[in-house]
Amino acid sequence: YLRHGLDGEYDILGVPYVDYECDVERGRHLILYGHNMGVGESERFSSLQNYKDPDYYTRHPVIRLDTLYGSALYKVVAVYALTARTADADYFPFNTYVDFADDEAEQAYLDEVARRAFYTTGDYVRPDERLLTLCFCTYEMEDARMLVMARPLREGERAEADEVHIQPDPQLPARWPEEG
């Protein structure tokens, strides 16, 4: 999937794929990985890099996910960055949270994401809602990942941006470059 298309032919952009531990049909947390090659706005996950900017979120608060099982709209709730190096002291194994033992475990995970987020959207995730996390490379440092977390658009809810809460001091990877 990393360097081949659905037809099996070589494709530098690969194909987005689901974490192997996720239950695609019934799981509580669906994690998708894709390339951000910076090639163009429409190239796989490249445009997701724009979510680092809260103004982009206000213009694009909803993500559409199309699968073999159907289509769904998800509302962005947080955007954060991680190191992919498991040896780094501040490594956060977000991909091990594909299901939650109980509501408290899920809340602990959401609190950890909020501590790391560039911003949160003033929205919240209900205990019965599925999470969607889109994970892709970002190039502020070597082996960095950006993550966009969303929850389903609720019945009757408008696809509009919620208020943005900029995190003044998010917990970024130690190797993350200083701004300005």
Question: Predicted segment positions?
Answer:
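Solvent-exposed, non-transmembrane regions of membrane-associated and secreted proteins
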Residues: Y1-G180
